[in-house]
């Protein structure tokens, strides 16, 4: 059983149904103007039903950050050495928390740059409506830990759209929404990064699942207006 929301693109939903999944699409916004609270409430209802499904709960499960602490970060260091800057998007915050914990444990001087979408509440910002699935949350993930010395940055979704479409047309590479957000953050900060720095950017998704959204002219015009095409 998959519980998703109106921000999910139709291709992903069709893909899941083709694989035999039962997909529920919630349509009510939560108190913060997103869908996560509504989705979580529905999942809890399903889990509590007699014979209900098992829920691994990526928002609270400590195995989520643990695997990134033990494997993702180790793979980065083994291949590239200790980065000076490491850009990570904040969704469930599993990748972000796992890497931050590993950096602290290693005693590395790596600056972890945590990237979120404007309108997300994870870093304590004001909630607002968001349209691109991936990064951001309308409910603060329980696994997010304030103790880590993160450099936190917000990216407006219109800049995510511009970045994704620019890269697709200039570089011939189709980034997903989360990847575009993190790349937009790097673009905004690149002039502040000392020359010769070793920078690692975690790109978690590709753009095929965003063809009906970020890469669809009608969708972009409806949600962001004509200025989104200025890239």
Regions found by a protein language model. Give the residues of each.
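Short glycine/serine/threonine-rich phosphate/pyrophosphate-binding segments
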Residues: 1, 8-13, 90-100, 178-186
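Phosphate-handling active-site elements
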Residues: 1-3, 105-113, 189-198
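Small/polar-residue-rich loop-to-helix segments that shape phosphate-bearing ligand pockets
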Residues: 3-85, 117-168
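Short glycine/threonine-rich catalytic loop with a Thr-x-Gly-x-Asp
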Residues: 56, 173-179
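Short, well-ordered alpha-helices that flank and scaffold nucleotide-derived cofactor binding pockets
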Residues: 78, 101, 105, 184-191
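Redox-cofactor binding/interface segments in oxidoreductases and associated redox assembly factors
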Residues: 88, 154, 176, 201
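Phosphate-binding loop/pocket of nucleotide- and phosphate-handling active sites
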Residues: 138, 187-231
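A short, acidic, amphipathic alpha-helical segment used as a generic capping/interface helix at domain edges
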Residues: 160-162, 167, 183-192
């Amino acid at each position: 059983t998959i519980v998703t929301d109106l921000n999910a693109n139709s291709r992903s939903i069709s893909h899941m149904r083709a694989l035999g999944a039962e997909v529920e699409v919630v349509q009510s916004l939560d108190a913060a103007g997103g869908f996560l609270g509504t989705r979580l409430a529905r999942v809890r209802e399903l889990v509590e039903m007699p014979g209900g499904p098992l829920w691994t709960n990526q928002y609270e499960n400590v195995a989520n950050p643990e695997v990134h602490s033990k494997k993702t970060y180790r793979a980065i260091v083994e291949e590239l050495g200790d980065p000076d800057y490491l850009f990570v998007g904040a969704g469930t915050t599993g990748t972000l928390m796992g890497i931050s914990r590993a950096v602290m444990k290693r005693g590395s001087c790596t600056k972890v740059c945590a990237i979120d979408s404007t309108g997300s509440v994870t870093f304590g910002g004001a909630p607002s409506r968001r349209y691109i699935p991936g990064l951001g949350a309308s409910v603060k993930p329980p696994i997010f830990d304030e103790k880590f010395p993160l450099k936190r940055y917000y990216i407006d979704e219109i800049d995510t759209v511009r970045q994704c479409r620019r890269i697709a047309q200039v570089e011939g590479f189709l980034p997903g929404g989360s990847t575009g957000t993190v790349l937009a953050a790097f673009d905004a900060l690149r002039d502040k990064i000392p020359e010769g720095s070793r920078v690692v950017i975690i790109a978690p998704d590709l753009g095929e699942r965003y063809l009906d959204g970020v890469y669809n002219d009608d969708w972009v015009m409806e949600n962001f207006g004509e200025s989104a095409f200025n890239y």
